């Protein structure tokens, strides 16, 4: 059972950004490029949430749930994301992206499955797949920063 001490932030998001502004600037540039990439904003948020769920990053899950809600991503897609394979609410393109997200996020546990690559490739051009993979890699990087430092999740209405 977690204690208050075991969930206390080790470093806050704002403090992290102030400590390494060059990193924050670089990540913001990647985010800006991805926003202009043509990959649907709703899909980008779904993959960010899914990778963050897998990596156990509370800050990133909440941050991207907030963004997804602002984009009016249907509630059932957010509610069922952890069980997306069985949910039946995702398009084939979304399902392929979510499967690819899991393949890339869990890279250390297995090699990338050729069949998963073939499935995602039928729904994404070469450029789109490269951009999708950059987006997945970026959120994995953020997860590996935010989770160890226990950034406080940005819960709407909570004092930050």
Task: Briefly describe each language-model feature range.
Residues 1-160:
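Hydrophobic alpha-helical segments
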């Amino acid at each position: 059972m977690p204690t208050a001490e075991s969930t206390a932030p080790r470093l806050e998001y704002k403090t992290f950004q102030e400590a390494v502004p060059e990193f924050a600037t670089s990540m913001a540039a990647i985010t800006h490029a991805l926003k202009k990439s043509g990959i649907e904003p709703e899909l980008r948020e779904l993959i960010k949430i899914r990778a963050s769920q897998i990596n156990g990053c509370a800050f990133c899950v909440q941050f991207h749930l907030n963004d997804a809600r602002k984009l009016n991503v249907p509630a059932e897609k957010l509610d069922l994301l952890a069980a997306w394979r069985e949910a039946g609410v995702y398009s084939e393109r979304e399902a392929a992206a979510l499967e690819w997200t899991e393949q890339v996020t869990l890279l250390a546990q297995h090699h990338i499955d050729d069949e998963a690559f073939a499935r995602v490739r039928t729904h994404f051009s070469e450029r789109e797949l490269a951009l999708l993979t950059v987006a997945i890699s970026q959120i994995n990087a953020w997860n590996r920063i935010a989770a160890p430092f226990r950034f406080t999740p940005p819960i709407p209405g909570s004092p930050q």
